[in-house]
Amino acid sequence: PERLRFTFNTLRFTSMDEVEEFKPELVINAVTVKYTIPAFEEVMPHLPEDCIISDISSVKTGLKDFYSRCGHRYVSTHPMFGPTFANLNQLSHENAIIINEGDYMGRIFFKDLYNRLGLSIYEYSFEEHDKTVAYSLSIPFVSTFVFAAVMKHQDAPGTTFKRHMKIARGVLSEDDYLLQEIL
């Protein structure tokens, strides 16, 4: 296993043998939404029975059904900030959602973690989460795409225009898969 930079007490495994040998109590799946369930299916045969599996996916579609039949305890969360605009030194202005349908101890772990980071925590069902994401992520992303598509270069832009353009550039620089998943 290789130690990860900037992350304490975290190891990166490159083979399933390393996972089996380590016997994790909690696995956090942080792949893109498209690969969340396949990644779980690949690693689960190598996990102890009592291991809690966890995702931090921005879209929860299909996960509730998967979790109900997977045979593992689970916890599902969504840090509501990303690499484009979040200030990792000032997370007290950011939010996280914890799905209230998962394992109690898993939820306590993430509540503690997110509290230590200073995040505002909200608890929603899978369905409530996806409605919130549709409203708070999808609509702003789509409106930003429309803004970027119809705007032309301004020699003397106003403050609001400059801020909108900065946001548009940031959103358009996101990973294509992330944008596809959110939309």
Language-model-derived ranges and their functions:
Residues P1-F6, R12:
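NAD(P)-binding Rossmann-fold cofactor-contacting core
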Residues L11-D17, Y122-S125:
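Short acidic-hydrophobic, aromatic-tinged amphipathic segments that line or gate anion-handling sites
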Residues I28-N29, S54, I98:
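Redox-cofactor binding/interface segments in oxidoreductases and associated redox assembly factors
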Residues M44-E49, Q90-L91:
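Short, conserved loop/helix-junction motifs that constitute active-site signature segments
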Residues L47-L63:
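ADP-ribose/adenylate-binding Rossmann-like module
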Residues V59, L63-Y124:
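Rossmann-fold dinucleotide-binding core
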Residues E123-L183:
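An accessory alpha-helical subdomain
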